[in-house]
Amino acid sequence: MKKILCPTDFSGTATKAVKFASEIAQQAGAHLTLIHVVHLPIVDTSETALVASELLGEQMRDASDKLKQLCSQLEETYGANRESNFTCDFVLKEALLTDVTEHLTKHEGYDLIVMGTTGCDSTMEELLIGSNTEAVIEEVNCPVLSVPGTAEWQGVNKIIYATDYAPGDKEALEKVVELGSVFGADIDVVHVVKEASPEAAAKAESFWLELQQKYTGVPLHFQEIVSKRADEGLKDYFKRENGSILAVLRKEKGFLQNLFSQSLAEKMTYQAEVPLLVLQGHK
């Protein structure tokens, strides 16, 4: 892992994401790039266009000052007097966030995006942050770690990967193992079934044997759990096992509306309770 992106609007939620991104970058010896975007409002007269242009210029200058200060603080905190290659820069654009992140991940070789997301009792501004996170996940071909505004950094000790035995699971697990190795974290591969059966047990055993053969020496564990609802089963397992990050595979557009169930999509985005790492399947 060499390069990490982290969008910020300087809100409390974004600050949490910057904390997570900085800790991961410091531990991995990676470069961190902060992103901030501004939008020129739609105008219908030359007079309002002039006012809007002046406002945009003011916003850009203010954001640039904040980004410079934040990068300086992060380099002082995470780069100074540590055995780390941590460095930080920023991108400031008048553009849509999805356009900027898609371009950077496609052309600049970024390995991970870290973004803030919010809970169901959020303000409208905070809900827009959650909406941006979902939009970025849908557009980029890069892992995205969404960090709830309520999350506190406690290291990465255990990553829980939710599998449904999709063809892309094994490739996605490579990214999970890569992140886990940075922290020496355990990785639990978890499959949820509504009820136990010999067929399910046989499929689970076959899948687990494949993983054991591929990931020798990796602290990888497999667990099949029984729950009528996948979202509740995963959440309970995550809490019981003191998970640090829940990882899932995005297989198609709109996956956040179809991931296991509608309720899981809701709980893991706008009502997020845990850091969620979304791995991208083939587009």
Predicted regions and their residues:
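Charged docking surfaces used in two-component/phosphorelay signaling
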Residues: 87-100, 228-231
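A short acidic, glycine-rich active-site loop
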Residues: 53-66
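Gly/Ser-rich helix-loop-strand patches that form or flank binding pockets
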Residues: 99-152, 240-283
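Small/aliphatic-rich secondary-structure junction motif
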Residues: 1-54, 158-224, 240-243, 271, ...
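N-terminal Rossmann-like dinucleotide/flavin-binding domain of flavoprotein oxidoreductases
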Residues: 63-81
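Active-site phosphate/pyrophosphate- and oxyanion-stabilizing loops and adjacent acidic/basic residues
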Residues: 134, 177, 209, 235, ...
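Short glycine-rich, flexible loops that bind phosphorylated cofactors or substrates
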Residues: 13, 122, 168, 230, ...
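A short helix-to-beta-strand connector/capping loop
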Residues: 78-89, 215-221
